Amino acid sequence: MTFKKIAILSASVLALSTFAVSVTESPSTHVVYAAKSKLKTRIAVPKGYTADLIEDWCDSPNSKKLTRKLKRLSRRGMLSNKFYDRRKADKRKVNLANLSNHDQYELSQYALTLINSIRTQLGLPKFTYTASAQGFANDIAKAYNEDNWSDYESHDISAINNIAKMHGLTHAGDNEYEDLAGFDMTTGHQYATIYQVKQGIYYNIKQFAFGGFRYHNWKESDKQNLNYYTEWYHANDLFTGDYSQEFALSLSYLIQDPTNKVNKITSSHYIHVDPENIEKKVLYEK
């Protein structure tokens, strides 16, 4: 099994247009990353990369000066951070179409650790995992499956807002809660090892943080090309804001072509909830 493609789409109102950022990073490129002398599950932020800089770019996305600076910093971040998980020998397989509660929790905590490693370096409060956010995330993934929807179609805005209403959250018609990513499965089944799924999550979050990086020639050398770092709306969603949000991750699984059952799409839903968006606590915490 290999991970072929990852697509990311922002929760930011300014990034709701349909687009996909396609990348590939084979397991052979995932070498151990050493933070100083200690191995960690983390993503290191380049010096000079700040929350203020991200916010400034979102306020002025046409600024050539800001864009040039963020492109260079993002390239540095993409090149210097490599996937590492101390449980590489763990070949336990998970059902991408039906994660157990244990798998959901483990993957959410893994994503949260990476996100908070960046937020901490930027001087921001950590996000927190809650069962309420997990329930919300799971229902969004279920709705994607029911709508035959994936990250290829951008956000399922209608579903997100309907589920938000069910969970007692504000639902103004925009996407306030989801950063969407995904990876194609090149094998003909719906199982992957937990290690492989974490590879996809790690790469998604690097993309979110560092310019929505996308491959064009499917080569590692693409990371050197500044033209492939194009936006920081995802970074604005996850790596700015001097307040905490509740967080959870869910996966949805779609057979893109039912006639041959080969092209499998796993969409990953990075769900974050601002406590101020909780209108009916009794529904959200049920």
Question: Model-found features: residue ranges?
Answer:
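Gram-positive Sec-dependent secretion signals
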Residues: 1-36
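A generic "functional-site adjacency" signal
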Residues: 28, 113, 131, 225-228
